[in-house]
Amino acid sequence: MRIVQLTTDAREHYRQYDKPVPYFGTAPEALLQGFSHLPEVEVHVVSCTQQRMVTPEKIAPNIFFHSLLVPKMGWMRTGYSGCIRAVRRKLREIQPAIVHGQGTERDCAISAVFSGFPNVLTIHGNIRLISKLNQDKPFSFNWLAARLESFTIPRSQGVVCITRYTQRAVLDLAKRTWVLPNAVEAAFFDVRPNPQTDKPPRILCVGVICQRKNQNAFIRALDTLALKQKFEVLFLGSASAAGAYEDEFRSLVQARPWCRHLGVAGRDELRKYFAEATLVALPSLEDNCPMVVLESMAAGVPVVAAHVGGVPDLVEDGITGIFCDPLNPASIASGVEKILTNPSAAEEMALRAKEKAWERFHPKAVAQGHLKIYQEVLSNVS
């Protein structure tokens, strides 16, 4: 089967045009890793860019890469019309059986629905819900992206929902839905947890520093626990240089000797942090299919996660992790304390989580799940 994956090259997103290797984000990268193990498929990754970049012909023996140059006027200000036209031209050359638009907030979804070929979409961020939560101003990026999401969903053959949370959000718009979680890069399954016993327990909190990720409330929630137990909290993620929430975060971290903000970590670094962590915490107010939870489970690291959004699809409370209420400081502290004070039970949960992750999130398993969806779509189209 010949498949096209429309996805964003991170070099375009972050304007890092000098980097020699394309990168498509953690979930799409892991899915491609899975496809590379399926010899029955031929995959073409197509990404639009505003500047020429180094473009390898192949990412894997059965995975080709196409970088399409689109002038600035062909992007969001014109409804991604330039991207749509460039993609259609390339697809006429490739002649795929099916097109998969990864993400609804930029050019990928709308290019998929106007591709002229059978297509499906994956929603990674639930932009309509995020925009509503953030109360975004009219004509801001998220406000426009939310409307783009509403436009594209009903025009596709279906939506691959990475959690039931997403499925519920699109049922009123989508022609068809399937629930299939994101894949996790295979290297995370090779992590061997080895917390440093000669140092305080290490709590890892990974994510962009922002109100939705709720780091400030998480810090305050642990103040009382820090009076009776030693631990350290490491925050990994970018923080805007200007912003009231980010400024408050920096003040909270600086005032507490048990807190550190280490900025953005690369994929190899992240796995090293996982190996040394006692637990990973996700205190978000809203999240769909947080990769840090999937990756923690794959690595065999205990998880304390907020009972919000799509997280209940990923974690079973008391079985493969611990839930907390992100609006209740006592609940957050209690979840963390359960892991810190009962390491044997925490280890058992982490082992069960790793088993579940092998079944549900391994790249090959998720790629095979996608292949079944594509076959269903094509059987209905024909």
Give, region by region, the residue ranges found by the protein language model.
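Short hydrophobic beta-strand element within catalytic cores of glycosyltransferases
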Residues: 302-305
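Aromatic "clamp/platform" in nucleotide-sugar-dependent glycosyltransferases that forms part
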Residues: 285
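Conserved acidic donor-binding segment of nucleotide-sugar-dependent glycosyltransferases
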Residues: 317-318, 322-329, 338-344
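Carbohydrate-associated surface elements
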Residues: 165, 183
